[in-house]
Amino acid sequence: MNKQISKKPAQRTIALNKKALHDYYVEQRFEAGLVLEGWEVKSIRAGRVQLRDSYVVFKGGEAWLIGAHLSPLPNVAEYMKADPQRSRKLLLNKREIGKLFGAVQKQGLTVVPLDLHWHKNHVKVEIALAKGKKTHDKRETIKRREWEREKHRVLKSHG
């Protein structure tokens, strides 16, 4: 018997940015590496990370993650001054940076982080080109989601 082995390694999610999926229409997704310090990796392993109000900016032909909060562990704060909200450089190909920068400049889209996950032994961030939702669009999405839940609930109870 041949066992089918998955070619794709398991991605363990560290943090999700649920607010981004609520506030934006996701156009296209990219995976980027992060430049981190040692204490930041330890904090990520401990799950002390938050992406809620973070976004991506472009400076000098590079992409930077702004506003991601990595809380330092108590023992790190004793030895050094840790900045939990410092800007972190994203590792992307030039072609990807050009595509993202062009879409932000020409189409008025924005780049937001969706999640932080482990890929093998590296921390990766999934970023997305996104278009902002209007308030009525958000309400419509909520109504549609509630209707789907109600429909499944009724079908489950009768079927």
Swiss-Prot record:
Keywords: Cytoplasm, RNA-binding. Disulfide bonds: none annotated. CDD domains: SmpB (cd09294). One of its GO terms (biological process) is trans-translation. One of its GO terms (molecular function) is RNA binding. It is found in: Cytoplasm. GO terms for cellular component: cytosol. It comes from the Bacteria. Gene3D superfamilies: 2.40.280.10. Belongs to the SmpB family. Required for rescue of stalled ribosomes mediated by trans-translation. Binds to transfer-messenger RNA (tmRNA), required for stable association of tmRNA with ribosomes. tmRNA and SmpB together mimic tRNA shape, replacing the anticodon stem-loop with SmpB. tmRNA is encoded by the ssrA gene; the 2 termini fold to resemble tRNA(Ala) and it encodes a 'tag peptide', a short internal open reading frame. During trans-translation Ala-aminoacylated tmRNA acts like a tRNA, entering the A-site of stalled ribosomes, displacing the stalled mRNA. This is SsrA-binding protein. It comes from Coxiella burnetii (strain Dugway 5J108-111).
